[in-house]
Amino acid sequence: MTDTVFSNSSNRWMYPSDRPLQSNDKEQLQAGWSVHPGGQPDRQRKQEELTDEEKEIINRVIARAEKMEEMEQERIGRLVDRLENMRKNVAGDGVNRCILCGEQLGMLGSACVVCEDCKKNVCTKCGVETNNRLHSVWLCKICIEQREVWKRSGAWFFKGFPKQVLPQPMPIKKTKPQQPVSEPAAPEQPAPEPKHPARAPARGDSEDRRGPGQKTGPDPASAPGRGNYGPPVRRASEARMSSSSRDSESWDHSGGAGDSSRSPAGLRRANSVQASRPAPGSVQSPAPPQPGQPGTPGGSRPGPGPAGRFPDQKPEVAPSDPGTTAPPREERTGGVGGYPAVGAREDRMSHPSGPYSQASAAAPQPAAARQPPPPEEEEEEANSYDSDEATTLGALEFSLLYDQDNSSLQCTIIKAKGLKPMDSNGLADPYVKLHLLPGASKSNKLRTKTLRNTRNPIWNETLVYHGITDEDMQRKTLRISVCDEDKFGHNEFIGETRFSLKKLKPNQRKNFNICLERVIPMKRAGTTGSARGMALYEEEQVERVGDIEERGKILVSLMYSTQQGGLIVGIIRCVHLAAMDANGYSDPFVKLWLKPDMGKKAKHKTQIKKKTLNPEFNEEFFYDIKHSDLAKKSLDISVWDYDIGKSNDYIGGCQLGISAKGERLKHWYECLKNKDKKIERWHQLQNENHVSSD
């Protein structure tokens, strides 16, 4: 294809010269019709380089493309990790026992089916029957998950199973979309020094010493056709992935092919497959340098290019590969097989791509310069990106009611609709769990039952938080999460929604139908998640809320019975207790002590509730004491965690009496004032001074 400018011709289309063809002109004949270069803008003819602003725009696009590839690699890594976890958690041998759950198979056990892929025996619960063939085919859940990974990672197309590298990397190059170049041995226009030395290596001194009349080959490190933009940058992972496709085609002739690949930055995403695979046609190895062509950068002998035929015309750009006679043209346009470069700027392009019969795309050589990594904040935001989040997560319908008289919050989970499929069969095993923020823990976690194999579950369950005060309603937020239960691995998060309880009016039920949002459970900077709406993961403020460590609450009832002549103390329940055992729970019980000491009859304790942070006791204790003496007494209530073989752990306590303050004093005073009336109050447990449990 000719690059010569015919300023004295009015015809926009031209055919290559029909003079007797030389050996080097066969390529030109194959080029066919071409755009007349006289239609180029004046700026391109003058070879003006890109401005700093344009280079910055290109840099940002390239950096974003590279970051998206890294995020895609991490997404595939998560899929592979899930598959590996399923393989590690197998419980059977696949012969006499189910390969997944380990259940006995055969006459005395469950029905047995054989997986079509791995040929292992599985039970019907762990196998899935597919009906896409004439006869039924059974697959185990591991093989179904493996097929899912192949489908979602693109491995089915590339015939490879990506694990640690990108499935199909894009060669990231710090180049601008430039003009295709013609045959070598054309005079080169001197170009100014590059303004970004970190992206382009220094040019040799030989170029500066050349006279205006000399016609020399280009320096391999320089790229005038790029507008002095830097050489391509290639990551190690990309080089590994594309090594198999370039084993049979080496462009490294005498070190002069380091610049043979020039894809426009705008096409890296769209042409990822074409840019890294050879053309379907025959691959031609380039011929060694001809005697009439420059073989070294310092050569000054002109070749029989277009400039030799038209000495009065100036070529537009200099040749780029002095060691090759036919530089690959598919790479210059970002496509394969002569497809034009879509999306490249027209004022930077002078000709369409070369013919399909040219040599296939070659991978660029590694460059010395590399773009600096993005800032840490951008890296953190990139890690939170999930390319699967384009699909909707579903909607959840629920209602809330704050019962102010009973200090309880009722959350009725009604149903969900259109949940994101999480299993290989296109369904999910959803359940809903609730947390109160700040201070989310097992103590304030409630959950519904799990519904199997559905994306539109209907629960109609009411979950109740006891001991919710007006103060809690002002500062607490309810987090409602929908998860998928996984029998063999970790439960997977589907989506969530949050509601600030201060917006809820007492004793008025409020209904909601809200779309779920995706939230990564980690503390993030405010700027990173500012676009996530009400599902922005709030800072856990356990340490900030009054600097008080929450130990839990206890519901106590007091009544002085004139008929029995004594005080009746009721221990009803505790909520949100602190976890004291390694399993995240406690084995709580409650001790009562009426002070000053009245002997053994002054001490009582409840039964022990195993492995719970929200125990329900419903026990009453009687103290035989006169009403006149009760005002001088104080009731010490303490909650303990029972341990075997060592001393019990103190969880928290409170003291009711004349010397108490706030709600504790008010509760004791109302008991003395209102005889034969049971008065219930919630009290906050505190880590007060206490004696050892007996």
From Swiss-Prot:
Ca(2+) 2 binds at D423, D429, D484, E485, D486. This is Rabphilin-3A. Keywords: Calcium, Cell membrane, Cell projection, Cytoplasmic vesicle, Lipid-binding, Membrane, Metal-binding, Methylation, Phosphoprotein, Postsynaptic cell membrane, Protein transport, Repeat, Synapse, Transport, Ubl conjugation, Zinc, Zinc-finger. Zn(2+) 1 binds at C98, C101, C123, C126. GO terms for cellular component: dendritic spine; extrinsic component of membrane; extrinsic component of synaptic vesicle membrane; neuron projection; postsynaptic membrane; protein-containing complex; secretory granule; synapse. Residues 202-211 have a biased composition (Basic and acidic residues). It is found in: Cytoplasmic vesicle, Secretory vesicle, Synaptic vesicle membrane; Cell projection, Dendritic spine; Postsynaptic cell membrane; Membrane.
